[in-house]
Swiss-Prot record:
Lineage: superkingdom: Bacteria
UniProt record similarity statement: Belongs to the UPF0125 (RnfH) family.
Name used for this protein in its record: Protein RnfH
Organism of origin: Coxiella burnetii (strain RSA 331 / Henzerling II)
PANTHER family: UPF0125 PROTEIN RATB (PTHR37483:SF1)
Gene3D superfamilies referenced in this protein's UniProt entry, alphabetically: RnfH-like
SUPFAM superfamilies cross-referenced by the UniProt entry: MoaD/ThiS
Upper taxonomic lineage: Bacteria, Pseudomonadati, Pseudomonadota, Gammaproteobacteria, Legionellales
Length: 101
């Protein structure tokens, strides 16, 4: 038997579920056994991106002791657009405070 953690986060809540599974267990089986799909019905496992220790991994991947399985949410905004928006907000803040920019 091996010990793993299933992790998922929303903007409001972070969940880590410790789980003990057989050494032959795959990632998809562990996620289903954890009960996280019942806690977060918005997770569509067939379309979800998953990883182990911050590295993208296939659903049929094998597991090792102390693995942390992470279920990632889809991006809500293009990363380039998000950075541009943050830069514009920063420029406006500097202008309001009277800083050069």
């Amino acid at each position: 038997m091996i010990s793993i953690i299933i992790a998922y986060a929303t903007p409001e809540k972070q969940v880590e579920i410790p789980l003990t599974v057989e050494e032959s267990c795959t990632l998809v089986v562990a996620v289903k056994r954890s009960g996280i799909l019942q806690q977060f019905p918005e997770i569509n496992l067939s379309q979800a991106i998953v990883g182990i220790h911050n590295k993208r991994t296939a659903l049929d991947a094998g597991l090792r002791d102390d693995d942390r399985i992470e279920i990632y949410r889809p991006l809500t905004m293009d990363p380039k657009q998000a950075r541009l928006l943050r830069a514009k907000r920063g420029k406006i803040r500097r202008m309001v405070r009277g800083e050069a920019g």
